[in-house]
Amino acid sequence: MTTSYVAVDLETTGIGTKREKITEIGMVKVVDGTVVDTYHTLVNPYREIPERVVELTGITDEMVKDAPGIEELLPSVVAFCDGFPLLGHQVIFDFGFLTQATVNAKMKFEKDGIDTLKLCRYLMPGPEKKNLGAACAYFGITPDTAHRALSDAMSAHLLYQKLMEQFGEARSELFEAKKLVFKAKKERPATKRQKEHLQDLLKYHRIESAVHIDKLSGNEISRMIDHIIFTYGRVPESAGGRKGKTAAGQSAVPRLFPESR
């Protein structure tokens, strides 16, 4: 059975790894069942955090405005996890975001992992809810703060220990870390022309934006441009418009920018 691991939990602006960003990282390093170290940091997503996410996590724009970006934190995150499998409740979610970030930074992040959600689905009674909060309540675990990264990482660790105590001897094969697989492509960097086009649109339509343009990928800027053109219209050529093209150089496709944005 796997008894040494790093329990991990991330808070993010949403679900998709290509469109959403990390806002908080919590990790708990465990050696032979004993907690030996923890890691916690807020992360600046360089964009506005959606209100529904603020309500869920309590993490606000004000809290992250002076926090480092994920690119600054990756070396310490990767080093903290080095030599250990990951453990988490739906661990592929956390692994996916970290993988996308490391791919963008041209770093490697290959890991084995243990998913406490899958263990709960195998081992808990069918009618019982299997989300982290419900599973912890079922096993008598009281988390410090729900939907905060370090607290949830600790809860996943304690849940795993309870599951091992009750089922490890009879179902030891379920408690072995397995290779985590998540395919991620490096995001295309934004061009100077894209950034200028977006800035022109924001200025002309007097749109206030909390997004840091220099931190956006090319695809993200293209989606923003398409959304602004669809909603507000183009910048007229007489006002310095860029001949009715999107930043990628193609005719704008009328489509709404994703709500999670």
Task: Give the label of every model feature segment.
Residues 12-14, 118, 155:
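Short, glycine/acidic-enriched loop or turn micro-motifs at the edges of active sites
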Residues 1-111, 125-147:
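Conserved non-catalytic scaffold segment of RNase H-like nuclease domains
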Residues 146-149, 213:
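Acidic carboxylate-rich catalytic motifs and surrounding loops in phosphoryl-/glycosyl-chemistry enzymes
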Residues 148-161:
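Acidic, divalent-metal-coordinating active-site segment for phosphoryl/phosphodiester hydrolysis
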Residues 111-123:
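A short, structured active-site edge motif that brings together acidic residues
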Residues 162-261:
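Acidic two-metal-ion nuclease catalytic site recognized across multiple nuclease folds
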